[in-house]
Amino acid sequence: MGRSRVVIPEVVRVPLSEGDYIDVKRDLNAGEYFDLLTVMAERRKFAKILAYLVGWSFVGQDEHPIPYALDDPEDARRDTIGALDKGTLRELVAAIDKHEAAQDQALAKKKATLPVTDGALVSAAT
């Protein structure tokens, strides 16, 4: 029996500096990944952040939470990200890139531990 080839929707918390965190999708499914590649090819800003980011712990100058929800329109979420300072944007990008690389590495390791078959085709008897 092989591995499951379906992405189970999960959210993981990624720590940032100063006690902050972001919540991101553990992994993108094929449709989400294709959408990400498409918007990245269109050079739309914050494409990868929008694909992964689910929420965060950020507060504004008034110490109130900065709202961010997947239910908000994409343009509103893009504008919210665009209002952050450059250092926070860099930290978001680095954290999501690191998370994505770790997930890719975990998948490669999982694939490497699967039993090797001889490549023979199996057909169902009718």
Protein language model annotation of sequence segments:
Residues 3, 20-126:
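Short, surface-exposed, charged amphipathic helix/loop patches that serve as local interaction elements
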Residues 1-10:
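Extended acidic low-complexity intrinsically disordered regions
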Residues 9-19:
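Short acidic-hydrophobic surface loop/beta-edge motif
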